[in-house]
Curated annotation (Swiss-Prot):
GO CC term, one of those recorded: extracellular region
Protein name: Toxin CSTX-15
Disulfide bonds: C3-C18, C10-C27, C17-C42, C29-C40
Keywords linked to the UniProt accession: Disulfide bond, Knottin, Secreted, Toxin
InterPro entries: Spider_toxin_CSTX_Knottin_CS
Entry text on domains: The presence of a 'disulfide through disulfide knot' structurally defines this protein as a knottin.
Changes after translation: Contains 4 disulfide bonds.
Source species, domain of life: Eukaryota
Location(s) in or outside the cell: Secreted
Tissues of expression: Expressed by the venom gland.
Length: 48
């Protein structure tokens, strides 16, 4: 059950992002310009 590193793909497991002592990375989804399906990557939370 390895966690998903920052900026890595979490499309198939939205709750897999790694957590540190301070915060948990958030699986953030977007649609690349030519893509038919969304792409999700683990990102640092925006409010920090």
């Amino acid at each position: 059950s390895d966690c998903t590193l920052r900026n890595h793909d979490c499309t198939d497991d939205r709750h897999s992002c790694c957590r540190s002592k301070m915060f948990k990375d958030v699986c953030t989804c977007f649609y690349p310009s030519q893509a038919k399906k969304e792409l999700c990557t683990c990102q640092q939370p925006k409010h920090l």
